[in-house]
C-alpha cells in the first residue's frame, strides 16, 4: 500500500510566524496602523521615580488602561460641571473640581497641587 504524500507540517496553534505576501507591481506597501498609548510617558515617569526598574508589556497595558480610564472619568465629570453651570468651555477650574470630586482625600490634594504647578509652568513658558 503506497504511503500518502506528506505535506508541510501544520504550524502549531498560537505560532507567531507572519505570513508574507508577494507584492504586485501596482500595489503600495501597507503601513502599520498607529496605536496611540501613554506608554512612553509612563516609562519616562517610571525612570524619574525608579531609574533601575523596568516594566513588562502586560503591566504597561494595565497602566495604559488606567490612564485612559482616569482621563475619561475626569473629562466626563468636567463636562457635566460645565453643563450644570451653563458653560460651553471646560476650563482648568472644571478639571480641578472634577479631580476633587473623583479622587479621595490626600490624593486629590496632591493631584490639584501638581496640576496647578503644571499649568503655571506652561503659562510662564509662553
Curated annotation (Swiss-Prot):
Matches recorded under PROSITE patterns: HISTONE_H2B
The protein, known as: Histone H2B 8
Modified residues (Phosphoserine): 15
A molecular function (GO) term: structural constituent of chromatin
Gene3D superfamilies: Histone, subunit A
Region (Disordered): 1-35
Domain of life of the source: Eukaryota
Composition bias type Basic residues, residue spans: 13-34
Stretches with biased composition (Low complexity): 1-12
Cellular component GO terms held in the UniProt record: nucleosome; nucleus
Keywords of this entry: Acetylation, Chromosome, DNA-binding, Glycoprotein, Isopeptide bond, Nucleosome core, Nucleus, Phosphoprotein, Ubl conjugation
Role, per record: Core component of nucleosome. Nucleosomes wrap and compact DNA into chromatin, limiting DNA accessibility to the cellular machineries which require DNA as a template. Histones thereby play a central role in transcription regulation, DNA repair, DNA replication and chromosomal stability. DNA accessibility is regulated via a complex set of post-translational modifications of histones, also called histone code, and nucleosome remodeling.
Location within or outside the cell: Nucleus; Chromosome
Oligomeric and partner information: The nucleosome is a histone octamer containing two molecules each of H2A, H2B, H3 and H4 assembled in one H3-H4 heterotetramer and two H2A-H2B heterodimers. The octamer wraps approximately 147 bp of DNA.
Disulfide bonds: none
InterPro entries assigned: Histone-fold, Histone_H2A/H2B/H3, Histone_H2B, HISTONE_H2B_site
Pfam families referenced in this protein's UniProt entry, alphabetically: Histone
PANTHER family membership: HISTONE H2B (PTHR23428)
